[in-house]
Amino acid sequence: MPGVANLALSPRKKKGQGLKPVGSFPKSVSPYKVQDMIGNVWEWVWEYYQPYPGNTFKTPAYEKKQIVVRGLSYMGVGHFSKKEFLKVVSLKARASYREHLNPLARKKDVGFRCAKDRPSFMERVFRVKADQPDK
């Protein structure tokens, strides 16, 4: 995805362009002005790897206290044939895609994602905390 994200683009070129500063891919800016949500580094989010609500799928990874990483990295997606490589990248190259990782693992292609909760409707409309008592 040249110009859009820092990702490996072929199985022969296993890596993207190495780490890049935030903002190096202006075509990837979201409507909320968030940058680099895919590519560059996997982003550690404040979440343990668990099934989504209502999902009955089971995996041993749910029992291991793995952390969630999102966004894919410049290091590639694993070992796939040329035919399958871009298909796999296109499936995983999205901000919502998640993988799991041991929280003690040290990887050069893992960073973290800063985020904050969306304000409640009342906070957005009245610009006050909804749980504050009237004065």
Question: Which residues are covered by each model-predicted region?
Answer:
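Short, structured beta-strand segments at or near domain termini in extracellular proteins/domains
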Residues: 108-124
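Histidine-anchored, small-residue-rich loop motif
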Residues: 73, 103, 126
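Pro/Ala/Gly-rich low-complexity, hydrophilic intrinsically disordered segments
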Residues: 118, 128-134
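Low-complexity Ser/Thr/Gly/Asn-rich repetitive segments
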Residues: 123, 134-135
